[in-house]
Amino acid sequence: MSKLPFLPVFQSTAWIPLLSICFLIGWLSPVDAKETTIIQLTDPVYPKKPKKEHSLTAYFNDEGFPSGYSMELINEVCLDGVCKLVEVTMYWDALGFYQSLEYPEGKPLTKVEHEPFVPADYEKLDSILKDRESILDDHELGFLASEKDDKSPEGEDDDEYQEVDGVSKATPGAVKEAVVKDAAWTTWVLWKYANTELVPIMQRMTKSQFSPDFLMHLLDSKDWRRVAFVINHLLGQKPVAPQYLDEIAALMPLAGIDHIELAIEYLRKASPDKNTCYRKLIGTLPELNGYNAALVIELLESDGQLENEILERLAASIGNQEYYLIHLALRLIEGREFFSNAIEADIVKLLEVQDFFIARRASDFLSNQKLSASAKEKLDAFRVKHADRL
């Protein structure tokens, strides 16, 4: 078989993208233990026919945790049965995210006129198969065969010319960018196997191995796809397990906009009380990006019964934030009509920051409070210094 173990393969002398190699390290290795399970899958080309049996291999690392899956696939890729069969082995990580494929020696993927894929084709295919949001999810194979192609090349018999992928029909324009050129059907079939029916099967198999150590192993990876997988599992438990509160709070600065709300939901549901949740969320504010920090402040603002201690913690956490977030926090504190020595001390510091707009916002806030003598002196000095800008 033309391959390197568990890596994307293009040809026997193929160029392997370094990023693909790095991404797979730690998930699959040639020494992993493995188990094979017989599963049944719908053939995406013929979805009304009985399901077909496939052998799904699960791999386990040296700690006994699931590290990934593979499946050999031999499948038709067109509706008329005359296309060349696709023969590959596909690989996924433990969460069911497609990772790579390889083909048998001498049997590369092909396209028009049996032309083998070149490295650029495999690279594009790899990126397509890793895109779970692909437009291919919205279309069936028949859609790719909805338009007749131009005539066969001069001297080519029509039937013979149709024996390759993507020749007998033209690819509709809506999906041209979502498939490998002249290999639309092959792309579609492989995408369906990579991202649809098989994914929940692998996820159930991985979840069947869940243990506190395995969950912590996934969290320790700091990979938010794995973290989200764990959180979704925890949120499905009743009651929601609280023992991962600190770990997930610590991971929030790494969360993107697709995951931050999931993390907040876990902290809300797993915390023994709302103040525990608020303390942990506020503790993350100095390291959160603007969007994520705004969501935390928005959550606090939605609670009309915030305790004074929480307001003080909020004031103490905003010193290194950008203007808009400081404005949101001060607006929240102003709306609760609460002021204390602790809040005074934290906001007075903002008068000295280099960003004048932040300092001016702090000045406006302090001007409406009953201040200590030292704080009033600093505020007055600021207002005199910047009188022409206030």
Which role fits each region the language model picked out?
Residues 132, 136-139, 143, 307, ...:
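Short, flexible helical or helix-coil boundary motifs
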Residues 229, 247, 262-263, 295-298, ...:
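Alpha-solenoid helical repeat scaffolds
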Residues 207-219, 241-251, 273-284, 305-317, ...:
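Amphipathic alpha-helical scaffolding segments comprising HEAT/armadillo-like alpha-solenoid repeats
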